[in-house]
Amino acid sequence: MKKVLSILLLLSINSFADDTNEDVSTIDGIINAYYEVVSGPKGFIFDFETDRLIHAPNAIITRFNENNDFQRHTVAEEHEPLLEPYETSLYEIEVSRVCQEYGNIAHVWSTFAMMETLDSEPFLRGINSISLYFKDGRWWIASWQTQYESDTEVPKKYLPN
């Protein structure tokens, strides 16, 4: 029985590693993972492990909310309020992307919408400005900044055509 459990554990770890490797080997993969870790139904538990794997050590997060209040902190500090399961469902989805890449660095302007369900109207929109670098055969998120839409709408160049 122990042998069977050990084999199952090894298979699940290898599967997780393969999935994570796919997530970070392309810009598409890492940006998709970036949104997947925060989105889920009521009771969803934030995917801390994947979030740690997509961010570089010491990655910095900067956020301007809809009132233009400023926050700047580390990924570890971002995790603190997410320790409990979600009280309501939350889906943050990418609606448009502008990517600029040169060598081992890339910058992604990612317009997002937040919704209570995947088929509901967004209750909030904004732009994530995501800085990436490629090292050791994979992409890393070095930093990201978020600006929630307020009185100033998201510019048309960052919206779907």
What function would you assign to each model-found segment?
Residues 65, 110-114, 128, 145:
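A mature extracytoplasmic/lumenal domain signature
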Residues 3-13:
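Sec-dependent N-terminal signal peptides
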Residues 23, 60-61, 69-119:
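Surface-exposed, charged secondary-structure patches
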Residues 125-155:
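Short beta-strand edge/turn micro-motifs at domain boundaries
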Residues 42-70:
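N-terminal, post-signal-peptide region of Sec/Tat-exported proteins
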Residues 16-49, 53, 160-161:
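Short, low-complexity N-terminal intrinsically disordered segments enriched in polar/charged residues
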Residues 72-74, 118-122, 151-158:
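A short, polar/proline- and glycine-enriched secondary-structure boundary/capping micro-motif
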Residues 55-57, 95, 126-128:
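Residues that flank catalytic or metal-binding motifs in active/ligand-binding sites
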